[in-house]
Amino acid sequence: MATIILGSQWGDEGKGKLTDILCPSAEICARSAGGHNAGHSIVAQGVSYDFHLLPSGLVNPKCMNLIGSGVVFHVPSFFSELEKLEAKGLAGVRDRIFVSDRCQVNFDLHAAVDGLEEVELGERKIGTTGRGIGPSYSTKASRSGVRISEVFDEAVFERKLRQLADGYRKRFGDLLKYDVEEEIARFKEYRKLLPNYVVDAVKFIKDAQDQNRKILIEGANALMLDIDYGTYPYVTSSNPCLGGIITGLAINPRKIETIVGVVKAYTTRVGDGIFKTEDEGEIGTKLQDIGREWGVSTGRKRRCGWLDLVVVKYSAAINHYTSLNLTKLDVLDTFPTLKVAVAYKDPATGEELDFFPADLSLLERCEVVYKEFEGWNTPTTHIKKFEELPAQARQYVEFIEQYVGVKVGWIGTGPDREDMIYR
């Protein structure tokens, strides 16, 4: 049976910690979408490991790991990440990682194009990580990309990559700083190494599910960055939602047991795009400092603000969570008053929206309707039992459950793996 961990906001919710906790009981850990733009850290036996492209199930020596068909696969990052894990003493990683032969290859060409497209957009830039994720998915959708399976046919590979580079050069001219022959030469070496890792992922997952193996699926990014359901166009270029998990891994939906939505106890966002509860003053700065809000992948500081339950309720309607993992509750310990967004009010009509609209111009003009809570002003760090939380903290958690309609099954109360309440 499969357990799925999904981000319910704009990413950086703390999915990695729950993945780390659940990994020891998993036989397979898989990723379904995105690329090396994602990022989180896992602490195992006192050592911190950074993961971007690779599934974090690699910290479990008994767990096999799969990069699914929906991922855009940057080959240099794959090998460099493996090397970094080995350098930190993680044993046997090369024997426990597999890649779908249907993955699209994310070339350095795509990263070069990513930067040029952001410049082209000017003030309307998306705020991407610059890792070529969007251009990779664009070439996939236009059917001009290269699949991993095609890397092994040298003639086909070179023809398709040259065509891709020629097309971009016609568009950008001398602004495109990229040497296609250099990339082709690098892939001559990768072609020798990749066969050890590439598998038919459809058969891999089918066999695993037929044998009732325990599969843990870690979502990258989050629902509000989904290409269809997020704050378009300020989104990623894949589907980091439940639907994307099913298509990206060919998972049998009837064999999904648990879907966990990970929710930070406040809200953060990296890059541009609408963020109704953002606080650019003292509150936002305090959340940023206490929560250590800067990205693993980019180092960029995260925008911070109050918890937006309209967003969480919307994501629950799409991802159908069976439970929530509320993270970083302890970050709120010193706030005398807390706020959560429960609706958006259109000042033109007076109408209150309790569901996230597609029309961002409507959202822009809306005012946030907040519910205030009394803070608890006492440390919650390292607390392991719900009953030991201050009454105000319990009230905060219970209101989230009531509003979203999903039970909070886990509550993070600190940075360590052990700092988790189970309910």
Swiss-Prot record:
Cytoplasm among keywords: yes
Gene3D superfamilies: Adenylosuccinate Synthetase, subunit A, domain 1, Adenylosuccinate Synthetase, subunit A, domain 2, Adenylosuccinate Synthetase, subunit A, domain 3
Annotated PROSITE patterns: ADENYLOSUCCIN_SYN_1, ADENYLOSUCCIN_SYN_2
One function term, GO molecular function aspect: GTP binding
Binding-site list for IMP: 37-40, 129, 143, 221, 236, 300
Cofactor field: Mg(2+)
Keyword GTP-binding: yes
Top-level division of the source organism's lineage: Eukaryota
SMART domains according to UniProt: Adenylsucc_synt
Quaternary organization: Homodimer.
Name the record gives this protein: Adenylosuccinate synthetase
Species, as recorded: Pyricularia oryzae (strain 70-15 / ATCC MYA-4617 / FGSC 8958)
Organismal lineage: Eukaryota, Fungi, Dikarya, Ascomycota, Pezizomycotina
